[in-house]
Amino acid sequence: MGFKVDLFEEEIVDNTKSYMFCPNHTSMIDVMVMLSVARNPFVFVGKKELTKIPIFGFFYKRTCIIVDRSNSKSRLAVFEAARKRLSNGLDVCIFPEGLVPDDESIVLSEFKNGAFRLAIEHQIPIVPMTFYDCKKRFSYTFFSGKPGKLRVKVHSFLSTEGLTLKNSDALKKQTYNLIYNELVNDLKKKITFSNISKIKK
């Protein structure tokens, strides 16, 4: 497809431990990027709608705990399944935004609580991840995007040791702010570079 993943890791996962991966979510290709950079076996918690996509859906179902967001029983069952995977030593990846926003001008949507509550319950680190280029390279808007580099940053882990569920909102906010600021700063760099290029011309 003409994509090359460029990975930068501030901290490297230990294959004897479990983690909760929390990347931003802007594109269908996010799932494939996550699979390409993961060092440990893991499962996604993912939405039912994506299973209907030809070819992609076939592989998606085999790497995901599927959630039907319109069904409260399904949501509860999903988190019970995630708990079992974590108890068995697997990592879990949850896109905490839940859905890709329809408005592509949104930098980062509000985070849901599930990933942070699960991480605290199991006392495992949050691994914030920034996907910089997936929206630009492979947007949900058809016939848009182009091949190129897909930059991924694994941020320093956020410990949940000693935290309780009362701390889940603060942990969620900390993770959100870290990824949001990273995306905004990257956008500022691109705007500055673009302006310099125009001046030189």
What is each model feature region?
Residues 7, 44-46, 66-68, 128, ...:
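Structural signal for conserved beta-strand scaffold positions within catalytic alpha/beta enzyme cores
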Residues 9-14:
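Glycine-rich helix-loop-beta junction characteristic of Rossmann-like nucleotide cofactor-binding loops
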